[in-house]
């Protein structure tokens, strides 16, 4: 995205956030900035193109290493293919389910600003304020610790784990509570997987995910604001937060038709794209597995982890 385009989005965003949130901590402002990055990333000018590009490069690498194997067809079965058919199989991208993905993405993008700003700009800072107040009552005044890069790494890790836990709980509940499943099953109605499938949601699902995200960011932000007496920023790599890097890449590839397994030892800690393919499978042995967004920790603790074997059959729907 060009710098002028970024300023077009970010400057009004900062003004709106300041008006809605007020002078809370720097952590709240960082949360606000992250919120608006998410909104901006859903605009047609920036559909996570960096992660999509990395996805394609990695897919080419898989095609080379596996000599044309690893791609899935619309029936969910692995099949060898030439490079172009490996990357863009016709039976997937012309499938009616893929066309529905496009329409639901457009709908989600139009509706998101209507509820996203309100929920994220109120729930997050409110949770942060409540956490700071609770710690002050229970323990005392903010500690005012010195911010180091090690603390920034810890803040990034705790934010990731807290977000992933809240995501796991919401996702698990959506599969267990009939009323919530009626909302979430729109996502699981996808018969093929494309990068746009990540946005294939009922219009009521977005506010639920947004509220959960804001709650997790706010609670962690409150703890670290109390520890340091002010805001702390997340550690970055190439000017991108570690959390955003992991989530963005994983989100793009796990709704891609190429199966990408991690080594088993790594799959015990991080969700591979192939593990999310299991989550989308309609085989009964795959039901209600792999609920978390990034890590495998919560699925391991709650007994819902499923690590697929190489080229395991995963029909979607």
Please place each PLM-identified region on the residue numbering.
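Short, strongly hydrophobic alpha-helical membrane anchors
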Residues: 1-43
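Short, charged cytosolic
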Residues: 16-24, 69-90, 172-188
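Interfacial loop/helix-cap signal at membrane boundaries in integral membrane proteins
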Residues: 22-39, 84-86, 134-147
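Short, membrane-interfacial amphipathic segments enriched in basic
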Residues: 24-29, 85-96, 265-268
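Interfacial loop-to-helix junctions that mark the boundaries of transmembrane helices
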Residues: 42-46, 232-234
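Specific transmembrane helices
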Residues: 46-137, 155-167
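Membrane-embedded helix-turn/re-entrant segments that form the catalytic/gating core
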Residues: 84-85, 90, 308-317
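Membrane-embedded catalytic scaffold of the fatty acid hydroxylase/desaturase
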Residues: 107-120, 126-137, 141-315
């Amino acid at each position: 995205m060009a710098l002028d385009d970024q300023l077009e989005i970010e400057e009004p965003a900062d003004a709106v956030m300041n008006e809605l949130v007020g002078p809370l901590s720097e952590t709240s402002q960082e949360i606000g900035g992250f919120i608006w990055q998410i909104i901006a990333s859903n605009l047609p000018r920036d559909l996570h193109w960096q992660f999509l590009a990395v996805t394609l490069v990695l897919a080419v690498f898989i095609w080379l290493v596996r000599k044309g194997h690893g791609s899935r067809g619309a029936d969910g079965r692995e099949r060898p293919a030439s490079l172009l058919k490996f990357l863009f199989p016709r039976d997937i991208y012309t499938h009616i389910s893929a066309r529905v993905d496009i329409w639901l993405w457009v709908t989600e993008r139009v509706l998101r600003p209507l509820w996203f700003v309100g929920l994220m700009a109120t729930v997050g800072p409110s949770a942060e304020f409540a956490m700071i107040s609770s710690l002050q009552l229970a323990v005392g005044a903010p500690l005012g610790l010195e911010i180091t890069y090690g603390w920034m790494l810890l803040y990034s890790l705790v934010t990731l784990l807290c977000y992933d836990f809240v995501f796991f709980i919401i996702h698990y509940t959506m599969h267990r509570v009939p009323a919530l499943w009626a909302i979430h099953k729109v996502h699981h109605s996808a018969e093929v997987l494309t990068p746009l499938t990540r946005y294939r949601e009922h219009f009521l699902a977005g506010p639920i995910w947004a509220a959960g995200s804001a709650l997790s960011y706010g609670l962690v932000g409150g703890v670290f604001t109390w520890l340091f007496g002010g805001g702390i920023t997340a550690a970055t790599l190439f000017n991108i937060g570690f959390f955003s890097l992991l989530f963005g890449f994983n989100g793009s590839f796990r709704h891609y038709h190429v199966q990408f397994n991690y080594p088993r030892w790594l799959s015990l800690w991080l969700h591979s794209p192939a593990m999310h393919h299991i989550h989308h499978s309609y085989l009964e042995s795959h039901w209600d597995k792999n609920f978390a967004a990034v890590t495998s920790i919560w699925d391991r603790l709650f007994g819902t982890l499923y690590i697929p074997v190489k080229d395991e059959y995963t029909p979607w729907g």
